[in-house]
Amino acid sequence: MIISKDRKLVVGLEIGTTKVVTLVGEVLIDDNIKIIGFGTCLSKGIDKGKINNLDLIVSCIQESINKAEIMADCQITSVYLSLSNKYINCQNEIGIIPISDDEVTKEDIEHVIHIAQSVQILNEHHILHVIPQEYSIDQQYGIKNPIGLSGVRMQVKVHLITCHQNMARNIIKAVEKCDVKVDQVIFSGLASSKAVLTEDECNLGVCMIDIGGGTIDFTIYIDGSIKYSQVIPYAGNIVTSDISYAFSTSRDNAENIKIKYGSVKKPPLGSSKNIDFSDINCNFQQNLQQDALIDVIESRYVELLSLVQDQIVHLQKKLHKKGEKYELLSGIVLTGGGSNISCLTDCAEKVFQKKVRVAKPFNISGLIEKITEPCYSTVIGLLHYGKESYINIDKKKKEHSFFEIIFKRINNWFKKEF
């Protein structure tokens, strides 16, 4: 977050396997976000969220931040930082307390959430997010906001997201070496969900899948609450490796081939064409049947999506045993750079047997022609988190000023009367 004299600015920083992106947004009077600064560079020194060369990744972060500062004409002092790696873990927990007075107060909610998160988590992990799913008061279930309601006992169900302490610490260290403070570390899957999912989709049930370069993040929402989240440590880069191996070419060439000619659906029988790769690498075989390339890409995408489908089925069985509702009426929402592959919707619908859409981030304005592609969903979601912090600060200021006004009126009344 950056507080300037006349602007409310928020900065998102995504340090991914393939790219580092810095985005500067201005929170407008109507609480919309206007993009005013953008900086990116290719990632070096990091793979699947794990830093393997601190100096290299610090250099990338600094370059990305510098570009965004120049475009936005501001100095970046703090950022909202995304995090995704195989050491992310999630668990659902319950907290129960007696209601202190006749009705639920803000303090009761803080207390019951504290109880819910005071559980054993994985060794060397710390909690990133505690997300309330629903509250129950006595025999009243499915309550979203219990403040002011009466009862004897309150229960909360929460979704905990944890990460390995050292993994998070090293990413933060890299950012701080650029003289920038981290306002909050946010799981990438949550950030992407914030950027691409609608409220209706979350209420009806939806699975958001962000296919990045090194990892796949996915989240499942039912009845407006997050029920499950996970990171799969394979994504777009493994497809690139498959192409490189299958056709004996470098990873850079394989990536270019994937972007330029890649698809997960073969053309109609008899219409497969020869692809001339001589412009990419003179040592590479000059012609290749399009079908051969698609075979490699499609088989890997089916495998990756099937890993998510297995987890969806597992959660479905788990909730069914508990007698809890499980429906994904809104289907599957794909995003991330890996979702740009041609015909992915058709391929995914076969795997999930549900409706599928590829989502771009929404609810932003400004320099949107640069950053409305699926590959920027995470960093845009970070801005939405920053916006919410501003909104909360404004609410507290209003509450404080309200009590100040009341106090002054009472004080003035006493002066007049006595």
UniProtKB/Swiss-Prot annotation:
GO terms for cellular component: cell division site; cytoplasmic side of plasma membrane. Belongs to the FtsA/MreB family. Cell division protein that is involved in the assembly of the Z ring. May serve as a membrane anchor for the Z ring. Self-interacts. Interacts with FtsZ. It is a peripheral membrane protein. It holds the Pfam family FtsA. NCBIfam families: ftsA, PRK09472.1. It is found in: Cell inner membrane. The keyword Transcription does not apply. Coiled coil: none annotated. InterPro entries: ATPase_NBD, Cell_div_FtsA, FtsA/MreB, SHS2_FtsA. This is Cell division protein FtsA. One of its GO terms (biological process) is FtsZ-dependent cytokinesis. It comes from the Bacteria. Keywords: Cell cycle, Cell division, Cell inner membrane, Cell membrane, Membrane. Transmembrane segments: none annotated.
